Amino acid sequence: MTVLTAPGFSGAAPTLPSVAARLACRAGNAEQTAGLAPGYVQGNLAILPENLAASFHRFCQQNPKPCPIIGMSEVGDPKIPSLGLDLDIRTDLPRYRVWRDGEMVDEPTDIMAHWREDLVAFVIGCSFSFEEALMADELPIRHIEQGVRVPMYRTNIACAPAGPFAGPMVVSMRPLKPKDAIRAVQITSRFPSVHGAPVHLGLPQSIGIKDIAKPDYGDPVQIKDDEIPVFWACGVTPQAVIAAARVPFAITHSPGLMLVTDLKNKQLAVL
Amino acid sequence: MTVLTAPGFSGAAPTLPSVAARLACRAGNAEQTAGLAPGYVQGNLAILPENLAASFHRFCQQNPKPCPIIGMSEVGDPKIPSLGLDLDIRTDLPRYRVWRDGEMVDEPTDIMAHWREDLVAFVIGCSFSFEEALMADELPIRHIEQGVRVPMYRTNIACAPAGPFAGPMVVSMRPLKPKDAIRAVQITSRFPSVHGAPVHLGLPQSIGIKDIAKPDYGDPVQIKDDEIPVFWACGVTPQAVIAAARVPFAITHSPGLMLVTDLKNKQLAVL
């Protein structure tokens, strides 16, 4: 687990953009979190009962590329001070998904009614952070240009299993010119806690993708003649694994509605 | 120019493997330098009269990926102490090529008879160094497996010209599985003074390569169905540029017969 300390939050100091974004999410005023609080890390959420949390933690430990943990709570504690002093995991995402036995049973804007003393929250790094670094280097991000969701694919790359958690790695795809793909490997290698370097490029069929035009999640994007598809491990992997495990109880974020933290993306760079 | 200091050479100390290799070359006992003194940097050689050396130096400065200078001499001085205290550039390569007006006129085992007070020697990093790092990471190098020369191609990537020196970048190609190609980008990015990260991967036609099975220099190698071609800037570029410039006088190394230096490959790693 990456241990990072966020700047402190104090009522007397100017409000951080991330805190303002989180307060807006808490108040139910966010339709999506993409674009909120630029420069700040957003994360995927997975909440599990303590009796499953150890297995899930081990799953993440063994599969750090799709499941990089950037913060987690104590058992039963809805706070994660390392990601924001005021942060309350029960209220600070715009929308949640509540799962029972592998079925989504509720999609509430807070989980006060679902919180239990045995729950553990995991916050997992997301590609927004490395996309910001790619764009800062003026690399084009096709799905952002086209205004659609990133295309994602189930692969034939098996995650290392842990307890009930097992399944294939899900990857996101961004088409790039070869020289930009090389640059993207360099840039994203600096960000191991938000999926890091690509896991694959070119040759979609080598990782079990039969039709690049038909993603399993998200939307298809154009791949130009002078571009190759570049694949990164994706934070949808743990969500798919939790759903496939049909565990008695779990809570996740609703797609596109992430947790905004007080960590800055640049803090995640290892170099 | 990368400034590095080689370990000192003293008659009293145990002889470095690089010094032993250089003495063997000096005595004319080396048929090739590949495999000599493992761990030590080998370099391409280009020697030009002072009135052309400034332009050539500027060419290298502007094209650091194909022409990374790892050492150069003072005008008229055959020593390059930073690469080896005892090193004599006139005798320490197994074989040289002497060029007049763009034609090779001699291929001697030393250049004592050709040395002049106005000559400047440039030693340029070579791919042996990064191939050693790739193999240390257990990545396969196809031309080494097949026992042939690395395939090299003229591209449509124009070098930045300087004085009479101009022309396309020449690249070397190594086929790799996509995940190994990503790893190779990371590894070779650590070695900017020996060509650094690849300049291209996949899509040979994008850089003007019409038939990957017909290299312009070296030998063809097998590319398996699950591999992509990965292209690095190549030290043949400055040699091709010197030949194309048809300069009145130049000396280079003979292909495959490089200068063995006292620098260690691991010293060249920036991380």
Swiss-Prot record, chains A, B:
Pfam families: D-Glu_cyclase. InterPro entries: D-Glu_cyclase, Putative_hydro-lyase, UPF0317. GO terms for molecular function: lyase activity. Disulfide bonds: none annotated. Keywords: Lyase. Its EC number is 4.2.1.-. Belongs to the D-glutamate cyclase family. This is Putative hydro-lyase RPC_1666. It comes from Rhodopseudomonas palustris (strain BisB18). The lineage of its organism: Bacteria, Pseudomonadati, Pseudomonadota, Alphaproteobacteria, Hyphomicrobiales.
